[in-house]
Structures are given as structure tokens and as C-alpha cells.
Amino acid sequence: MPGLSDPVAFIKDFAAGGISAAISKTAVAPIERVKLLLQVQHISKQIAEADRYKGMVDCFVRIPREQGFSAFWRGNLANVIRYFPTQALNFAFKDKYKQVFLGGVDKNTQFTRYFIGNLASGGMAGATSLCFVYPLDFARTRLAADVGKGAEAREFKGLGDCISKIFKTDGLVGLYRGFGVSVQGIIIYRAAYFGFYDTARGMLPNPKTTPWYVSWAIAQCVTTVAGIVSYPFDTVRRRMMMQSGRAKSEIVYKGTLHCWATIAKQEGTGAFFKGAFSNVLRGTGGAFVLVLYDEIKKVL
């Protein structure tokens, strides 16, 4: 584990996390866009009720037919730009927080403290990085939710256009809409994502010699469980993001709590999990990130 005074080790952590994240996110971009559309279509001004996607398969079929095959990667560049610092900071700060929460803790004799320390370090790492990259996360969501068929029908021309338009209409608040519930969700997700993964690997006889497929299986289980548990928070935050830039008369949700209540009342609790199966499939990429990160660190 790199020390706090070891900048080389910190940079290696940053590079390994960022590179592995960029590769995996590009690979699963089509799945992520489908997931986002299923989550926010009920609040989208571009998708009429009669034109809403019926499910994951319907969405996969209609996107290339209506928007072109390359539309599967709409917003992917913004996602890579966002995800590189997000994941890199998550991994880098995770080890820093582990030194704070796990310093001097023996995993064999202090398992409870070891487990809680891993949960805390993972959650704090996710929350810290989110503070820095939230506007990029916001823009990625809005670009992916843009279903305009041509340049003129698109709501935003690109990442810069999205950020500038929202900033002009709503200011910085618009770019950080949904931040509160995002922090709640990210702490829950990252706590499980890093906490359970590191705890499981820590219980192995020799993590450094563990076969890659064992690490992948552990990571797959972790990302699936973490994704499902935190999914409702993700749905609410993305619904809130969709309201930025709108006129007051077009605002549907008065706040985060009102959003939770409105979705549950009008659409049912199942609405919080729309696109969740796509998220499970996307989790394969998340599991790949964890394994690839460990492998890249061995090379660096």
C-alpha cells in the first residue's frame, strides 16, 4: 500500500484506475445509454408518452433504427472524460482513506473493525471524487438522454454546449442538481463496491496470487449487489438532473423528497428500478475495472 508521502505510488494508482475505467466504460457504453434512457424517459421533454421505450430490448432495437448505430455511444466521450478522473480519484483516495481507517488494524483478529474500515474508506473515496466531477456527470446524463435524430433536433451540441447552456439558465445550482441524493447513493454504492471487494480479497490466503477469474467472480458479485442496492438513489438523482434548464412551469419535482414521493405514487416502486437489469449487465464492466486495475498496478 503506498504511503501518504509517496507521490509515485499515488500517480500509479491514479493512472491504473483511470486507464482501466476508460477502457471498460467505452465497451459497455451502449448498455449504459439504454439504462439511462429507461430511467429518465418519463421526465424527458423529447419522448412523448406513446413513444416511450417498452423495455431494454425495445430500446436496443429502436436506438439504431431511429438515431443511427453510432447513437449507442452518444455522450460516451463526455463519459470517458468524466469517468477517468472519477474512477482514478476513487481508487487513489480509497488507499489514502484506508490508511486513515485501517492503520494498525489486523484483519485476522479485528475482522469487524477491518470490515467497517473498508466500508468507510470506499464510501469516503466515492463521495470525495463526486464533489470534483459532478458537473461532468450531469452533462454525461443529459447528453445520453438527448434523443434528437439530427443536429437541429438535438438539445445539446456537445459537452461544452450542455454545460454552458445550463449554467446560463440555472447557474452552478443547475449543474449540481441532484447532488445531495447522489452523495447518499455513491456512499452506499462505493462502500459496498470497495468494502466488500477488499474484504473478500483480504480473506484469501494470498490475494497477489489469486487467479484472475476468482477476482473477477468476486468483483462481479460485488458490483451486482452494490448496483441494485443503490439503484433507486441513482434513478432519483438522474430525474432531478433532467429538470435543469427548464422553465418553472415545466418543473415536475419540487425537490428530492418530492421526487421520491411522486415517482412512488404515480409510477409505483418498480419505477425506481427501471433499467436495473441493464445496470447488472453494465456491472460486468465495473467488475472488469476492479480486476484490470489490480493487473495494471502489477505492471506499473
From Swiss-Prot:
Its main location: mitochondrion. A motif (Nucleotide carrier signature motif) lies at residues 237-242. The chain crosses the membrane at residues 10-39, 77-101, 112-132, 181-201, 213-233, 276-293. It comes from the Eukaryota. One of its GO terms (biological process) is mitochondrial ADP transmembrane transport. It catalyses: ADP(in) + ATP(out) = ADP(out) + ATP(in). Residues 237-242 are annotated as: Important for transport activity. Belongs to the mitochondrial carrier (TC 2.A.29) family. This is ADP,ATP carrier protein 2. It comes from Anopheles gambiae.
